[in-house]
Each structure stands twice: as structure tokens, then as C-alpha cells.
């Protein structure tokens, strides 16, 4: 409990986002992933979430990832729906990436048109750490993805990518905020949408460079078809 309390709901602020507050209030259990100092996980860890119910259902998922100094790991989170019901899913992921650590985080959604999903990902990076975050939406109803990433130590870098392939009446929003609190950090964002029919997509990316964050490098690209 003391270990979890050190990290849980520290960067996922309940007073800044209503969905995060709702998830924090309603979440009954969650997933804790802890990678100790200098441990390098060679194989990708896959986490599969399957929505299964005989009635309409709301679910609230919570994930806490703690990677200590020099740790390396890759994670693939997959969302699927097994039943033709109305689902409302909220998800909050908090990831702490220690000094010289490396995190690859992939989030894939392939549900159905009755699924409503809001996913908030919060990442905190220490000095010389590396993060590769990829969010992929293939089949859904309405989806809103949010990424808040903050640099706490110099020399860190992140690569944040998104891919959306949607048709019919699918709706997909991606919102990002990269907070350069210290200097000598690099952020790269690339989001691509392929839309057909009545599908709608939106992308809003913000980069905040704090006073004194010298030699910041940031690139943001959004391409659509």
C-alpha cells in the first residue's frame, strides 16, 4: 500500500479532468506493473481487455506502471468487445519512467460501434529516459484519447504516434499535451487519420515549454486522408 500510495493518482489529477475523477472514484481494482532498477524485459507484455456482458455495461480500468532507473519494457494493451451491447469504458494509465529507463507503450482498440471509450494516459519522464507511445484505433463507436506527458529530467525524449482507420459513423479524438518543464528534452508527435463515409476525427496537440527549458526540441505532425 505504501508503494502504491507513492505513485497512485499523483500525475493523474482528479481536479483537472472529469473522466479521471470519475475513474478514480469508481475503480474497484486495477493493474500494477513494476519493473525494478536495471531490469530489462525482453519480450513484449500483452494485456487484453475484453468487454463481455449480457446487459449494457460501464467499466472503469486503472493501470499503474512504475519503471525504476535503467529499466526497459514494452507493453501492448488491446481492447476488444465480445458482445453486441452498449459499453462505456473509462481508462486511466499512469506511467512513471525513471532515469535512463525506456518504455514502449502501445494501445490498440478494436471494439464495435456501440462502444464509448475515454482513455487518459499520464506519463512522467526523468533524466535521459525514453518513451515510445503509440495509440491505434481500428474499430469503435466514439473514442476520446488523451495523453499528458511531462519531462522532469534533462536529456529525455518521447515519440508519440497515433493511427486512426475509421468509416461509417466512427468518431475518434486524440488530444495531447507535452510539458517541457526542463531543458535539453526532445518530443516528436505524428498522428495520421484515414477516414471514410461519415467518420469523424479530431486532433489537438499542445506543447508547453516552461521558462528556462533551454534547448528544447519539439516536432508535431498531423496528416489525414
Predicted regions span which residues?
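Conserved beta-strand/loop scaffold segments within soluble protein domains that form the structured core
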Residues: 2-225
